[in-house]
Amino acid sequence: MPGHPGAAEQLVKTGWRSWHLGFWKALAPLQAAWDAFSQPVPASCGQLLTQLLLCASLAAAAAGLVYHWLASLLLYPPGPSAMVATVCGLLVFLSLGLVPPVRCLFALSVPTLGMEQGRRLLLSYSTATLAIAVVPNVLANVGAAGQVLRCVTEGSLESLLNTTHQLHAASRALGPTGQAGSRGLTFEAQDNGSAFYLHMLRVTQQVLEDFSGLESLARAAALGTQRVVTGLFMLGLLVESAWYLHCYLTDLRFDNIYATQQLTQRLAQAQATHLLAPPPTWLLQAAQLRLSQEELLSCLLRLGLLALLLVATAVAVATDHVAFLLAQATVDWAQKLPTVPITLTVKYDVAYTVLGFIPFLFNQLAPESPFLSVHSSYQWELRLTSARCPLLPARRPRAAAPLAAGALQLLAGSTVLLEAYARRLRHAIAASFFTAQEARRVRHLHARLQRRHDRHQGQQLPLGDPSCVPTPRPACKPPAWIDYRLDALRTESSEGEGKELWSCRDLSCNLGPVPPPCVTLGKSLHLSEPRFLHLHNDSIFTIDVTYFPRRDVVRMEGNTGHDRPG
């Protein structure tokens, strides 16, 4: 049906209008709360209650964040952490409620988090989190591999000593019988085998203790570094916010590059909207979401540096996983080492013959008479790992810490893109707290735009040939670029006193009659300009200007200091 598309479009427009109206209605209480918060002195009891409620909420939130930061992240004891958080909350409430610049400073610290100082804080916290999680884990896995080496060494030494002991026992079991005949069995075991075993045990134990101490030292160093760096960056955050507020209040040129609504209204009232046609490149639209080319280029460069940090984080995480896999493979190999059973059987038979040569003469075997028969069996196990040496399991990498570090780095990367908006928000916050200062800054920006427009207009004037029509009159009029407002400075002087205000001289000696002055470039001079602020109403001011258009000299002389007649 033909009516359906129009009805659907009308329905969409109505829905969009309703959503937009509802959105602004929802923002109205927030705007009222912000107006009350940014007022130096509340105008009503409602604003006072709103201001106190906001200050109390911010103080409670600050106390909770401080406690979580101290107790959970920096691992301080709960008791001192709660005490410090309570004191911080009380100080924040009193400062916000009684000192308006502190409220502005507190509000400025929020967009400052989205700038370079906040990015440093996020990156330092990310690095510390990654170091606390990865470095001890890598050292623990190296320690597990070292424990495998210790257990294998200890087990091999035990097996060697046990084998030596069994062989020594077998040689002793033979006793004096081993000395029968001309041959004997001699087996000698050194008595310092236990000392060697203890020495190797101490060496391996020392290596493991060194690894354990290194792991504890790395954990403590990372935690201490995180505490110090976080504290320094938080202090730097407050200092940077205070520096911005100081420069905003003392320097009219500082961060005064935004085309705000106040500037637009002032230009409209002064009928000077042409000053923004076209706007200068350095002037940023405060309410516009589009970034300038300079801002985009700066964002790309900083994102490149953050990409290098992400690569370093990925390398650290990969190192952690490789160390875990190697330690796990080593521990599994040690656990699967077989136990080798060894059985030593000693069989010793002694027999004798009497007149054995007689049967030998008849090519017969001599009968043997058994004299001694010894049968001994010795069994033990050859273990490559010691039963008294427990194997340490490989420590699996924690996924939460690298993910948190990566999230913080991505958040820091987002602050690169949001830094331009954070600067605009910071300017808007300071302007809402100090409206009189913002009005002075708007007037200064208006004057700057006016000067830029005047320079631009002066550069656009043509510099062609002067058009002079010779006329035989003895005097010449003032140049056209002298503003008509200088007529008020002219004075009728008495005869013989002073000089004529305007005089023209033809110094080229070849043009015949004196032409009128020809000016191709100039500007109007106003008494409101800074170079004329020293003049008083009781003085006559004349201008002495020399201009040379193509060797034709026009000279205008001026006198000052003559009293006004009457």
Swiss-Prot record:
<feature type="topological domain" description="Extracellular">
    <location>
        <begin position="326"/>
        <end position="398"/>
    </location>
</feature>
<dbReference type="InterPro" id="IPR051856">
    <property type="entry name" value="CSR-E3_Ligase_Protein"/>
</dbReference>
<keyword id="KW-0472">Membrane</keyword>
<dbReference type="GO" id="GO:0071391">
    <property type="term" value="P:cellular response to estrogen stimulus"/>
</dbReference>
<feature type="transmembrane region" description="Helical">
    <location>
        <begin position="129"/>
        <end position="149"/>
    </location>
</feature>
<feature type="transmembrane region" description="Helical">
    <location>
        <begin position="228"/>
        <end position="248"/>
    </location>
</feature>
<dbReference type="GO" id="GO:0071356">
    <property type="term" value="P:cellular response to tumor necrosis factor"/>
</dbReference>
<feature type="transmembrane region" description="Helical">
    <location>
        <begin position="399"/>
        <end position="419"/>
    </location>
</feature>
<feature type="topological domain" description="Cytoplasmic">
    <location>
        <begin position="1"/>
        <end position="51"/>
    </location>
</feature>
<dbReference type="Pfam" id="PF07782">
    <property type="entry name" value="DC_STAMP"/>
</dbReference>
<feature type="topological domain" description="Cytoplasmic">
    <location>
        <begin position="249"/>
        <end position="304"/>
    </location>
</feature>
<keyword id="KW-1133">Transmembrane helix</keyword>
<feature type="transmembrane region" description="Helical">
    <location>
        <begin position="305"/>
        <end position="325"/>
    </location>
</feature>
<feature type="topological domain" description="Cytoplasmic">
    <location>
        <begin position="103"/>
        <end position="128"/>
    </location>
</feature>
<dbReference type="InterPro" id="IPR012858">
    <property type="entry name" value="DC_STAMP-like"/>
</dbReference>
<feature type="topological domain" description="Extracellular">
    <location>
        <begin position="150"/>
        <end position="227"/>
    </location>
</feature>
<comment type="function">
    <text>Probable cell surface receptor that plays a role in cellular fusion and cell differentiation. Cooperates with DCSTAMP in modulating cell-cell fusion in both osteoclasts and foreign body giant cells (FBGCs). Involved in osteoclast bone resorption. Promotes osteoclast differentiation and may play a role in the multinucleated osteoclast maturation.</text>
</comment>
<feature type="transmembrane region" description="Helical">
    <location>
        <begin position="82"/>
        <end position="102"/>
    </location>
</feature>
<dbReference type="GO" id="GO:0034241">
    <property type="term" value="P:positive regulation of macrophage fusion"/>
</dbReference>
<dbReference type="GO" id="GO:0090290">
    <property type="term" value="P:positive regulation of osteoclast proliferation"/>
</dbReference>
<feature type="topological domain" description="Extracellular">
    <location>
        <begin position="73"/>
        <end position="81"/>
    </location>
</feature>
<feature type="topological domain" description="Cytoplasmic">
    <location>
        <begin position="420"/>
        <end position="566"/>
    </location>
</feature>
<dbReference type="GO" id="GO:0072674">
    <property type="term" value="P:multinuclear osteoclast differentiation"/>
</dbReference>
<dbReference type="GO" id="GO:0016020">
    <property type="term" value="C:membrane"/>
</dbReference>
<protein>
    <recommendedName>
        <fullName>Osteoclast stimulatory transmembrane protein</fullName>
    </recommendedName>
</protein>
<keyword id="KW-0221">Differentiation</keyword>
<keyword id="KW-0812">Transmembrane</keyword>
<feature type="transmembrane region" description="Helical">
    <location>
        <begin position="52"/>
        <end position="72"/>
    </location>
</feature>
<dbReference type="GO" id="GO:0045672">
    <property type="term" value="P:positive regulation of osteoclast differentiation"/>
</dbReference>
